[in-house]
Amino acid sequence: MDTNFYALKVAEIIKETPSCVRLIFEVPENLIEKFSFTQGQYITLKATINNKEERRSYSICSCAKTEQISVAIKQVQDGIFSTWANSVLKVGDTVEAMVPNGKFYTTLHPSNHKKYVAFAAGSGITPIISIIKTTLLTEANSSFTLVFSNKNIINIIFKEDLEALKNKYPNRLQIIHILSQQRADAPLNFGRINNEKLNELSKLIHWQNIDEYFICGPEEMIFCVRDFLMDKHVNKANIHFELFTSANKSIKKNTTTVTASQSNITIKKDGRVSLVTINPSNPTNILDAALQQGGDLPYACKGGVCCTCKAKLVKGEVTMEVHWGLEEFEIEQGYILTCQSYPTTNEVEVDFDI
């Protein structure tokens, strides 16, 4: 994976809601191939804000076949990067970006006749709309149902885009809005995505007849939907989900010393080898230890959600707190997320080049 950053110019800024902007980037001719993407992927952005480097990952919300690369950034409380993007960033500015990454997609083919269902909450719509646009354009015989949860109408990101898509594909796209803080005409459209609401949706969606599911949003909603679908005997392989979490916020926090003595971490990246030490009196994950000791390693969310800091564990053992960014087969092959990995042996070796 290319972990370098490249300068992209902000070509256009669209105010999607009072607290969300869409940034459309101009990709230089020499970078077009590098920044080609698959629907559902994300890019990691980097900027210096208040004299400090900040990195965040944002899902691409464009059609992978016809649109310029763009992301939507919803301002969150105390969010350094999101506040900067919503209030300071302007057209013509440049932002550093990594090439697209992520596995939140399924392979499309023009001959497919599939039924897709997506669940999105709030800004979880960002990768979903890319998936919907690209899927309906690529597979003329496939259909899509979107269940989209928001507080109220004014907070619906991509409201106009979704209406345009519904008009373009009236027989192939169904959109079910669910509002938690604004009464709707029908009971189905009021509330939250929970087990009760999913049972109500059973009147419209025949769960076992759907080929692929996509879920994106907060943890509670994702696992509620996933567990519901698995209870309905939906194949786990057909349930794809992407967890959104605040940058630099781990879902769990390590509170125990995992080694009785110092751990020596050998790190290989870009053909170069460096050594990092972790003292048991101050247990630190491999990524943070390397950064604190002057290392230059790839990272973004630091929450175990993206896979930017993924490396191969070549020697020794580690314990990972969470690993949402890894597939089960990757874990079996020895891959780890260094932002979540604490050494449990005195000698550990990780390779970012494999």
Could you describe each region identified by the protein language model?
Residues 64-67, 109-114, 343-352:
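Ligand-binding loop in jelly-roll beta-barrel domains
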Residues 84-260, 264-266:
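FNR/FR-type flavoprotein reductase catalytic core
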Residues 261-298:
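C-terminal accessory/binding modules appended to enzymatic or scaffolding proteins
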